[in-house]
């Protein structure tokens, strides 16, 4: 059973997503267009995405095991023929530590398995190290675009890279191996402490 599940974004999700769009860290790390948009304009935009724009972009709701909303993922720049898209996500502040990484994995898994996307375009603003360390960001990026985004009064540099299905699986396998190594070290340390 998956730790985070993905479901379709609905009208009931709009107020929660608008609150996320207005959150300060979200604005600094992704986009701050919500600062200059009214609630009515933001609501209309979300409803338009739900009703009319599924061929070019989609919003997904990320849920904890009990069904509560922990965040959202959205895909843009969809090319159905080439099976590519850009994936973005935002986790609600109170769930970032507990669900952040699992939410990202769930979103990637969903768009690959359910929407048949083979290549995902990733964009992360260079200062945003909430999920990817600065070193990993430098290693992954293929394009570095200075002055890419203007958020909360500053020009931001963006890093872009693509990730195929095979590359994503290798990353997941490496994470699983690291978790196993850590668990084994903890077990070994606990066994030594118990024997003493």
Task: Give residue spans per PLM region.
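A short helix-loop-beta-strand connector motif used in the catalytic cores of GNAT acetyltransferases and
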Residues: 48-61
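Acyl-donor (CoA/ACP) binding surface of acyl/acetyltransferases
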Residues: 1-23, 63-196
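Conserved GNAT-fold acetyl-CoA-binding loop/helix
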Residues: 26-47
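Hydrophobic, helix-prone linear segments
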Residues: 8-9, 45, 49
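Short, contiguous strand/loop micro-motifs
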Residues: 28, 33, 51-52, 94-95, ...
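An N-terminal domain-start capping segment
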Residues: 32, 36, 58-68
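Short, intrinsically disordered/low-complexity patches at protein termini
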Residues: 39-42, 50-53, 94-95, 154-157
């Amino acid at each position: 059973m998956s730790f985070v599940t993905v479901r379709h974004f609905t009208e009931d999700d709009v107020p929660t997503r608008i609150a996320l769009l207005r959150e300060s860290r979200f604005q600094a790390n992704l986009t701050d267009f919500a600062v200059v948009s009214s609630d009515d304009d933001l609501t209309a935009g979300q409803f338009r995405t739900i009703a009319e724009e599924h061929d070019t972009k989609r919003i997904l709701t990320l849920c904890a095991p009990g069904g509560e909303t922990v965040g959202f993922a959205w895909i843009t720049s969809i090319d159905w023929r080439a099976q590519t898209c850009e994936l973005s996500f935002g986790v609600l502040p109170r769930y970032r530590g507990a669900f952040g990484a699992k939410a990202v994995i769930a979103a990637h898994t969903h768009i690959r398995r359910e929407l048949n996307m083979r290549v995902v375009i990733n964009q992360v603003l260079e200062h945003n190290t909430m999920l990817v360390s600065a070193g990993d960001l430098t290693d992954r990026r293929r394009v570095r675009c200075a002055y890419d985004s203007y958020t909360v009064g500053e020009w931001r540099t963006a890093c872009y890279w693509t990730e195929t299905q095979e590359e994503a699986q290798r990353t997941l396998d490496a994470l699983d191996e690291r978790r196993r190594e850590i668990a084994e070290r903890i077990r070994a340390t606990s066994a030594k402490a118990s024997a003493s």
